[in-house]
Structures are given as C-alpha cells and as structure tokens.
C-alpha cells in the first residue's frame, strides 16, 4: 500500500520525466534486453538495437502507461485493466518480466536523476512498480 508520501514521490518523479518518456522507457527496455536476454523473445519482430525507433516507441508506451498509473494511484486496477488483459491473455508475458523491467526502470531513473533519487524516492518508486506489476499479473490467475 502506497502511503501519502509515496504517492507524492511517485507523482513528482513521473512529472520530472517531462518530454522524454520514450527516451527513458526505451533506455529501460534496452537495459532489460542487455541484462536479461531471454526477455527478447516477446519482441522478435522489433529492431532491438540500442536507440532504435522500436525501442523508443515501445518505451514511450511503457512510460505513458506508468504515467497514467501514477495519475490513478488510488485505482491502479481500473487504470491498468486493459493492459492487464493484454499481457495476460493475448501476449502471455511471463510475470517475472515485470520485475525485471521494474528494476531496469529504477536503474534508468537513478542514472538520469541522481539528485532526486533519494532513498525515500527509491523506496516509493519500488513500491509503485511492485504494485503495478501485481495488477498486471492479477489476471493470470
């Protein structure tokens, strides 16, 4: 459960992404594919070279979905219902991949916003991403 302080930290962090959601999301995906090559199996039709338009486009979708979730912290299941259905029933993404991407997102944010990435912000973002992952995997059962 996200506390009031967690919610403030999450919203502030996503607002700081500004006009760069595709860049941050794409970089996080790139980190995931390099660190965990088995995650590439879901993207066989993509150009997975660093900085490719496919990575940026999908990275923007990921970042936009997280921004939407950050705007609906009191109703994550409602905000992410369509994505949960998509990932569980159509794409059949292995649930562990959400944790891997969450880790890569945290690393990317820490690398680009070191002054803002305090231990409290890190903890809040980790809780947020864990909550998002839980919602996205809820329809697997």
UniProtKB/Swiss-Prot annotation:
- PTM Phosphothreonine: at which residues? 8, 108, 134, 137
Binding-site positions, heme b: 87
- Leader peptide range in chain numbering: none
Q: Where does O2 bind?
A: 58
Matching entries from Gene3D superfamilies are given as: Globins
* Record-level Gene Ontology MF annotations: haptoglobin binding; heme binding; iron ion binding; organic acid binding; oxygen binding; oxygen carrier activity; peroxidase activity
Q: Which InterPro entries match?
A: Globin (IPR000971), Globin-like_sf (IPR009050), Globin/Proto (IPR012292), Hemoglobin_a-typ (IPR002338), Hemoglobin_oxygen_transport (IPR050056), Hemoglobin_pi (IPR002339)
Q: Which UniProt keywords apply?
A: Acetylation, Heme, Iron, Metal-binding, Oxygen transport, Phosphoprotein, Transport
Output the GO biological process annotations, alphabetical, semicolon-separated. Answer: hydrogen peroxide catabolic process
Q: Name one GO cellular component term.
A: hemoglobin complex
N6-acetyllysine-modified residues are: 16
Domain Globin spans what residues? 1-141
UniProt-listed SUPFAM superfamilies: Globin-like
On the tree of life, the source organism's domain of life is: Eukaryota
Subunit relationships = Heterotetramer of two alpha chains and two beta chains.
This one is known as Hemoglobin subunit alpha
Species source reads: Sciurus carolinensis (Eastern gray squirrel)
